Every structure is written in structure tokens, then in C-alpha cells.
Amino acid sequence: MDDKINKLKEIIKNSNNIVFFGGAGVSTESGIPDFRSANGLFNEKLNITFTPEQLVSHSFFERYPEEFFNFYKAKLIYPNSKPNDAHIALAKLEEMGKLKAIVTQNIDGLHQMAGSKNVFELHGSVLRNYCVDCHTFYDEKFILESKGVPKCTKCGGIVKPDVVLYEEPLDDNVIRGAIDAISKADTLIIGGTSLVVYPAAGLINYYFRGKNLVLINKSSTQADSKADLVINDSIGKVLGKVID
């Protein structure tokens, strides 16, 4: 393991345009579980068990807003979570001028809380919420303190989290920014993701000019064979050792 850590240190030292692509594994170390590991919910009224994927779909939000928000508040918002060693190390790399962008599948805002500035949030953020009718902004606290379905204080419309639900497209501007950053990178570090969620996982295909592809994940991924360095360990532990 020490050999791999030293190799990663060497790669970082010789890189000037690093991009980090991260998934749920980055945030699990801050106590935020991957929502896909959540149990499905049984709806007694309908006599149906919904999967986590169904519960955070656009059609479920439209048809059963109350049930959507019950699940959303219980399983997707973690207001007491703090950045871990991975978030802090990445913010330091940006401060050093090495890291140029973070592309994340997470919606918790922990990268920004750690100090990272150039973050492309592919799936949005729980910290931003907007009225579906008049587009008034509301913060995470408003959602958590709302009883039942959050309603706009100005017009009474439903306040929807600015997160990309299943059946919804990703934001074009975010995608363009992420592709631009990845395609220009000299080193791409992929961490805390098994690369199975599309279209997000497909973005790594835009990395074809760089010198170093690094994969840090507890389990193996489909991209391991293409990588110059694979470390099967905790992302926080690895990055914490690299940026000490």
C-alpha cells in the first residue's frame, strides 16, 4: 500500500491540472449512506413496496409529494454531516493550484463546505430548493422544518429540491463544464464510485488526453483495467495520507 501511496504522491507532484471525479463513497465517510442501500418503503395505503429509485423519481414526486418528502427528509438530508479527510485534502489540492475541478455525483455540498470552489454537481444539491411556480429560493433548513410538503411562503407552490431525480435530465451547463474540465485534465482521480450510475459515469470517457488515470475505491470498478494506478481502499484514508 505504501508503494501505491508514494506513486500517487509522485503523480500529484508532477501534475498541474488534476480533476477529481467522485461518487457516494466520498460522503459515506461523513456518515451519509448511499441512498441505494436504503430499504424500500412499504406503502400500506397502496399495498406497494417502492424501491429507493422509485421514491426519488420525478413521477413519484408528482404523484405522491408527501411520501416523496418523507423519504427525502429521512434519507437524503444530513444537516449535521461534516467534510471528511477526502473533502479536506481535495480543497487543499485546489488551494495549491494542482486541482482544477471536482465533478461529483453527491448532493450534500460537503466539497464546498471544505473550501473547494470549482465544483460541478452532476445531481444538484440539497442546499438549494426552489418554488416550482415562482422560483423563489429556499435553503435546506426550510425543507427540514416544513411539515409535510414544503410550500412557498409567497405563492403557495411546492418547493422542490434542486436535485436531479430519476427521469429528469442532467443540467446542460453542468455537463458541459464537467466535460471541459475532464477533457483538459493531465490527471484524473476517480474516487468513491463504482461507475455504474449513468449518464454520470460516462463522463470519464472524455478523459483521453491525460497522462494518469487513478482509481481509488473500496471495490473494483469497470475502469480498473484502463487505470495507471488502482488503490482499493477508503478514499479519505488514501487522500489523507497523500496530502498530509
From Swiss-Prot:
It catalyses: N(6)-acetyl-L-lysyl-[protein] + NAD(+) + H2O = 2''-O-acetyl-ADP-D-ribose + nicotinamide + L-lysyl-[protein]. Belongs to the sirtuin family. Class U subfamily. Nicotinamide binds at F35, I107, D108. NAD(+) binds at A24, T28, F35, R36, Q105, I107, D108, H123, T193, S194, N217, I235. PROSITE patterns: SIRTUIN (PS50305). GO terms for molecular function: histone deacetylase activity, NAD-dependent; NAD+ binding; zinc ion binding. HAMAP family: Sirtuin_ClassU. Keywords: Cytoplasm, Metal-binding, NAD, Transferase, Zinc. The active site is at H123. Binds 1 zinc ion per subunit. This is NAD-dependent protein deacetylase. CDD domains: SIR2H.
